[in-house]
Curated annotation (Swiss-Prot):
Protein name, entry field: Interleukin-12 subunit alpha
Pfam families registered for this protein in UniProt: IL12
Gene3D superfamilies in UniProt: 1.20.1250.10
Family note: Belongs to the IL-6 superfamily.
PANTHER family: INTERLEUKIN-12 SUBUNIT ALPHA, INTERLEUKIN-12 SUBUNIT BETA-RELATED
One GO molecular-function entry: growth factor activity
Keyword entries, A-Z: Cytokine, Disulfide bond, Glycoprotein, Growth factor, Secreted, Signal
């Protein structure tokens, strides 16, 4: 093949590759970060810090309760109730929005994390799922703290900073969903079991807080 044909072939391939990227770019939902998203990023960072501090304190205080990540039985209270991990995939990896949409209830979105008129469906779905996660954990932690306050040993309580951080991020998201409010699990008042359950929940919630913080960082940089 002559040099001219080689040059034309390379130029054609480069052009086709460029057009393919442009087509892909047009097919992706647009997400524009605004001041509200930056505020939510700050709240998610505060939440991750508060959860990490609370978990560290629990591991130190409950050192004889098998409270390390290697010792506990991992449990996700949001399993089969929310789809945060799937809904919060980066937009370029989310290939089937309709499958995710089918798993959600209708939503009324008033959150200041959203940029009016510029937020994709996938972003809204992700943030609403995060809100539902926070709501479930908040209910569980409040019920658990009520039990811990009845413990004669007064050994450990939940850090108010963590509960406040959850509330602040929920307020920033400000989703009003039609889902039925979650009820805390009703168990026998066994303080040993409650403390073990606290460790399990804190480990699970910290993992979820990492996911939330990473997603807020991603949306803020979009």
């Amino acid at each position: 093949m002559c040099p001219l044909r080689n040059l034309l072939l390379v130029a054609t391939l480069v052009l086709l590759n460029h057009l393919d990227h442009l087509s892909l770019g047009r097919s992706l939902p647009a997400t524009t970060a605004g001041p509200g998203m930056f505020k939510c990023l700050n709240h998610s960072q505060n939440l991750l810090k508060a959860v990490s501090n609370t978990l560290q304190k629990a591991k130190q205080t409950l050192e004889f309760y098998s409270c390390t990540s290697e010792e506990i039985d991992h449990e996700d209270i949001t399993k089969d109730k929310t789809s945060t991990v799937e809904a919060c995939l980066p937009l370029e990896l989310a290939t089937n929005e309709s499958c995710l949409a089918a798993r959600e209830t209708s939503l009324i979105t008033n959150g200041n994390c959203l940029t009016s008129g510029k937020t994709s469906f996938m972003t809204t779905l992700c943030l609403s799922s995060i809100y539902e996660d926070l709501k479930m954990y908040h209910v569980e932690f409040q019920a658990m703290n009520a039990k811990l306050l009845m413990d004669p040993k007064r050994q450990i309580f939940l850090d108010q900073n963590m509960l406040t951080a959850i509330t602040e991020l929920m307020q920033a998201l400000n989703f009003n969903s039609e889902t039925v409010p979650q009820k805390p699990s009703l168990e026998e008042l066994d303080f040993y079991k409650t403390k073990i359950k606290l460790c399990i929940l804190l480990h699970a919630f910290r993992i979820r807080a990492v996911t939330i913080d990473r997603m807020m960082s991603y949306l803020n940089s979009s």
